[in-house]
Amino acid sequence: MNEISEIKEYAKRNSIPIVLDKGGEFICDTIVNRGCKKILEIGSAIGYSAINFANLSPDIYVRTIEIDIDRYSRAVDNIKNCGLQDRIKIINEDALDAKIDEKFDLIFIDAAKAQYEKFFEKFKHNLSEKGVIITDNLFFHGMVENPSLTHNYSTIKLIRKIRKFVSFLQLNPEFNTTIYDKGDGVSLSMLNPDFIQPEYKAVTEARNETIAKEIEYGHKIFSIFENETETGVFSFYRKEDFFVINFIEISATERIEITVRNMLMFVRKDAIDSGIHLIKIKLPEEYRFNGIKEAGLTYTEDGTYIHKL
C-alpha cells in the first residue's frame, strides 16, 4: 500500500473527514485544466488533499491551514513521509486569524462549515485575477436538501448555516458560482468580470410621490450606486415572517441582474439577523431579468420573486 492509500485508510479508521473520491477528482481536474500552480487550503486535516494536489505536478505549491494540533502533527508527518515538505507549507492556526498576503490560483475551503462564509470573505482577497474558490460538503450527506434525515438539533443548526452559505454564493454579485453534484457537493466560484463594488445611500428626502409614500409607510429606502452612478432605488420592510423588497426605480437596465443581486446581498444580513428565512421581491414587469436560477430566485404567478435563505 502506498503512502496516500495509507493516509486514506487512517482517516477512515479514525473518522477523520477527508474529501470524497469524486469531489477530490473534480478538484484535481480543475487544478490541471486551469494550470493552477499556487493553492491555499483551509482545513488540512491530516494532509490528504494537500498531498494529492502537490502530487499532480512538481510545479505546484500548497499552503494549508489546520487548527487542530493532533491533525496538524499527523499532517506534518504525512507530508514529510511523502517527501513534499518543500512544496507544502502547513500552518497550525485558526484560519480566521491567519495573516496571508500571497495570491493563489485556487483556494479550497474544507474546514468548519459554520464558518464557510467568513472563510470565503476573508480569503477572497488572496485570489488571483483568474483564480477559483472551491468549497466542499455543500450537500452534507444529503441533509441540506432533505433535513428530515436528522433529528439532531446541532446538526439541524449546521444544515441551516450551510443553506445560508449556499444562498450567499448564489446571490453574491462579485462571483459567478456553480454548484456541482460531485462527492458531497462542491461549489466553484470565479470572479465576475462585470462586477462593480456598489455603495448604498439612505434616501432621506422624498424625491417623488412614490418614495414619499414608502417613507410614510415606515419602509427603509436605499439607493444603489456604482462608480457614483445610481443604478436603482429600493425599499424593504418586514411583513409577518418574511421580508418584502420593492424596486422603486431601476436606472441601469442592462445590469438588472447584478443590481438585484447587490440589493439582495445588502438586505440579506438584516433578514438573517431578524430570523427571516424568506424574501419576496417585487420587480416591475418591464424589468424582469433572466438570471432567476443563478440568483437563487423562484418566480411566482403573481409576479413576485421568492428567495429562501
Please provide the spans of the model-predicted regions.
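A short alpha-helical cap/connector motif
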Residues: 1-108, 113-134, 138-195
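Short amphipathic alpha-helix that is part of the acyltransferase structural core
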Residues: 8-11, 194-216
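Conserved short alpha-helix immediately C-terminal to the canonical SAM/SAH-binding motif I
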Residues: 70-74, 263, 287-288
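Conserved beta-strand in the GNAT
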Residues: 223, 229-237, 244-247
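Conserved acetyl-CoA binding element of GNAT-fold acetyltransferases
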Residues: 241-253, 303
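Conserved acetyl-CoA-binding loop-helix of GNAT-fold acetyltransferases
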Residues: 256-269
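Conserved GNAT acetyl-CoA-binding A-motif
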Residues: 271-284
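Conserved active-site alpha-helix within GNAT-family acetyltransferase domains
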Residues: 284-302
